Amino acid sequence: MILPCPAAGGAGETLDGGDKWVQVVRRQHDPEVVVFANLLSAAECDALMLAAKPRLSRSLTVDTHTGDEALHPDRTSQGMFFERSENELIYRIEARIAKVLRWPVKHGEGLQVLRYRKGAQYAPHYDYFDARDAGTPLLLARGGQRVATLIIYLKEPEAGGATVFPDLDLQIAPKRGQAVFFSYPQALPSSLSLHGGDPVTGGEKWIATKWLRQHEFI
């Protein structure tokens, strides 16, 4: 399967983002996990949060039985979605993501912004759609399987809130403007893509998430 993948380069390398160069902080393979240093500027982080704030509501998860969205106790953040290319800021960020990850903008879901207040968390989970779930065919019809995730840190909390990968014994501390990318070539636990957000224990954490699909997302 062809997957989104940044160009070759390890820690310290810079990648062409179209309108700026993006630095690689950390990279590992099998599974592919890449941390970028400066994907967004501080001004872009602020602008995203400002635009998202009035549209926030309790975050939903995909109901795997129906394919619809529903509240779930494992996810306690607030969130919203931007439409693809909704405004100039979103267009610019999505174009940069597409350039760095070498994956078409149209193969991505709308950018989701999430706010985690003190105590909020997201229990470890997989982003792909499980073939055993009744709602999966409806989800796949919109653009095929999810094959990769990009998490961008818009605001770092005072404490807590790390992105964790339990199967990799890996923790990534939120840092404003940084992002973590990971792919999952198979929709199976063997992809080692189990991940979650630790509870925020001080301040607030804001992130933006981009899920990438096999085909054009509709």
Model segments located where?
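Fe(II)/2-oxoglutarate oxygenase catalytic core
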Residues: 1-218
